[in-house]
């Protein structure tokens, strides 16, 4: 639930974009910049939140993150200037949600599960994206008629409601409740340490080692494109884009909800395929198809049938890139550094999402249309696929095991 609320808070900026524009008269680029900053901090805080979980504990880090999210969004109810929105929904909520991001799932998995770690982490990752998209129609319903305060209040109360549950119901270690990690042999064996950075300096050191390898930059760059084409563009601007074509916010949010449902299927299937096929080939297919679909979207008739087909197709590919990216990180950076390196690769994802969240709004403000933004993003998807194909042909890389 904490992961869901954190991701849901970040996706809420897409719901309130048009209502804020109508209520305050702020331009689309200004509103988009705040969404971009929040997305960027959401990713950047992750590696350092892992260090905080090691020093003060998972529960305290969660409480701090949820408290900051609740306070910053609640305070925004009284905002009157763009910088109020930037501070509350960009800076403060970005930091707070970053402390309760995917790194939390990884920390809990490593501390509480000795076996089935991949399955549990996959479920947490998929359900976070799926859940956030599923609840968007309700938030869009609250924003009918240009209302934005009911949406903000709902998100704030959701963050606040979780605080007592975390404070009283989240043990720090399995031993605190007289048990051991799931699947652990020997009931008194201590839990294994988290695979994230224990200190900020260790996170930086892992980044320095990884940056010397071309594979890091390839994965960082392609994950940049992943964020650019999902959270940043579709997640932030699809509702507004559909509004330009006369589609009501609730119906547009329903498309995101449908994507969320099929994301669960696509991500699970991607994990199964990653265990059996070369992850580089999978990434080539995922990025190539995603890019072509984004290029095609602006030229559809925006009827119910065409948008439904797009939502299903795009939902299957929403975060299907995560399992093969993690697999390549494990193969190239080793068991010790791979989780930390993936945390930095995920920063690239959020950088791409931030670039699209701001850039698409700027393009819409300058041209009056989202068409160039979707075509450009689609082009980046195709380029990412071609770079992966070039890497596969020039570099043999570690052997990929096949059953």
State what each model feature region is.
Residues 67-80, 289-302:
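C-terminal ends and interior cores of transmembrane alpha-helices
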Residues 89-126:
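Cytoplasmic helix-loop-helix junction between adjacent transmembrane helices
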Residues 20-21, 52-53, 134, 138-146, ...:
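Interfacial helix-cap and linker-helix signal at transmembrane-aqueous boundaries
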Residues 124-175:
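Helix-loop-helix hairpin linking two adjacent transmembrane segments in secondary transporters
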Residues 13-17, 208-267:
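Extracytoplasmic gate region of multi-pass secondary transporters
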Residues 45-58, 267-278, 364-365:
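Helix-to-loop junctions at the C-terminal end of transmembrane segments
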Residues 20, 99-113, 320-333:
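Intracellular juxtamembrane helix-capping segments at the cytosolic ends
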